[in-house]
């Protein structure tokens, strides 16, 4: 049988009863929304606990029948035959409940800001950045998420030197957070006459989109500078100082937005800054929680080489979990679920091991 934290289970059951009671006492709209949200979060956990308790009860009844010498022998045989299937159901439900009880990432249900930057490899790296952005865009559309480009800098022969976009929807960050890191591509460039394979790289940063309630940016902690926006080759695209640079003084984080609307640039720069500051706080909590964890999955370390896309072999390898798939074309078309589910599973296994050790 799986070891379950009984004290925590009792606390959750008690909390669920309190929420149910408070929701029926006509709270104001704001309180009701908060209670309903917590209720929805706890409901699958409580349903799993109740289903398990029912199975425990059935097993106890069957064991009573089996051990009662006064009971008809045929009834005892039937009970003996039924017992293994119930134990199997219990084992499965206990594992599911264990996953439900794992520590939650506070940002999992949020939308995400995805930043892709070309690394080593010049024009090839920019083209690869474009491939990665289209991959995430298609993955997002398949999940009915909304994609909006915040800013971009195009490569000389296509793709992007840098592109930043928001991907909005429920639980976006819980899936895409595993994409942070260095992505490497191996392929023969179209301009390569000798048929040699070139290696290029791009860095992906996935940040949870933060609300004002999540992170408080004090006016005295930021410096806002305006400057002339420039187009390709440095020429001025308009006559007003529309570009905005926001510097967060305590951390030194700097965000620049250079589209045509100064108002929009300011709003988007603050949006990115808020996400970066929120991610710093989140990473602190995660690093404290996982100091003893060996798995790097979900660590968000952007200097870590996480995945290689090998075009000649049609192969994609995720180095964190040693997963290799020979369906590069489908993955670049947005078929990422197999990789992401494997990463989530590995992360959950690491958390379970951590719980067992504690």
Swiss-Prot record:
GO cellular component terms listed in the entry, alphabetical order: cytoplasm
Cellular compartments annotated: Cytoplasm
Region annotated Disordered, chain positions: 284-309
Transmembrane feature ranges: none
Keywords: Cytoplasm, Methylation, Protein biosynthesis
InterPro entries, per the entry: PCRF, Pep_chain_release_fac_I, Pep_chain_release_fac_I_sf, Prokaryotic/Mito_RF, RF-1
Post-translational modifications reported in the UniProt record: Methylated by PrmC. Methylation increases the termination efficiency of RF1.
Pfam families to which the protein is assigned, alphabetical: PCRF (PF03462), RF-1 (PF00472)
Residues with PTM N5-methylglutamine: 235
One MF term in the entry's GO annotations: translation release factor activity, codon specific
Keyword Signal appears in the UniProt entry: no
Family: Belongs to the prokaryotic/mitochondrial release factor family.
Described function: Peptide chain release factor 1 directs the termination of translation in response to the peptide chain termination codons UAG and UAA.
Protein name from the UniProt record: Peptide chain release factor 1
Organism field: Bartonella tribocorum (strain CIP 105476 / IBS 506)
Taxon lineage: Bacteria, Pseudomonadati, Pseudomonadota, Alphaproteobacteria, Hyphomicrobiales
């Amino acid at each position: 049988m799986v070891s379950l934290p009984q004290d925590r289970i009792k606390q959750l059951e008690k909390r669920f009863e309190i929420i149910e009671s408070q929701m029926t006492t006509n709270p104001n709209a704001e309180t009701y929304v908060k209670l309903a949200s917590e209720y929805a979060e706890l409901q699958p956990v409580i349903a799993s606990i109740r289903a398990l308790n029912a199975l425990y009860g059935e097993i106890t009844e069957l064991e009573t029948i089996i051990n009662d010498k006064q009971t008809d022998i045929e009834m005892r045989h039937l009970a003996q035959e039924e017992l293994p299937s119930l134990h199997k159901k219990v084992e499965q439900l206990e594992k599911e409940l264990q996953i439900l009880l794992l520590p939650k990432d506070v940002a999992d249900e949020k939308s995400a800001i995805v930043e892709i930057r070309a690394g080593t490899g010049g024009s090839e790296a920019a083209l690869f950045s474009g491939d990665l952005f289209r991959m995430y865009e298609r993955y997002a559309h398949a999940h009915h998420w909304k994609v909006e480009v915040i800013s971009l800098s195009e490569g000389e022969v296509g793709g992007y030197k840098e592109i930043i976009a928001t991907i909005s929807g429920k639980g976006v960050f819980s899936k895409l957070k595993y994409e942070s890191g260095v992505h490497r591509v191996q392929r023969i460039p179209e301009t390569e006459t000798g048929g040699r394979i070139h290696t290029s790289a791009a860095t992906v940063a996935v940040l949870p989109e933060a609300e004002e309630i999540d992170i408080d940016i004090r006016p005295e902690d930021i410096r806002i500078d305006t400057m002339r926006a420039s187009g390709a080759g440095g020429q001025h695209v308009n006559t007003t100082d529309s570009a905005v640079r926001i510097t967060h003084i305590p951390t030194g984080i700097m965000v620049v937005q250079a589209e045509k609307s100064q108002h929009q640039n300011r709003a988007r720069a603050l949006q990115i800054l808020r996400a970066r500051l929120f991610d710093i706080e989140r990473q602190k909590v995660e690093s404290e929680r996982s100091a003893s964890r060996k798995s790097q999955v979900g660590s968000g370390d952007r200097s870590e080489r996480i995945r290689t896309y090998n075009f000649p072999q049609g192969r994609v390898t995720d180095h964190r979990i040693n997963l290799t798939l020979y369906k590069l074309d489908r993955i670049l078309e947005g078929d990422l679920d197999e990789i992401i589910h494997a990463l989530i599973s590995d992360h959950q296994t690491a958390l379970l091991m951590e719980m067992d050790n504690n």
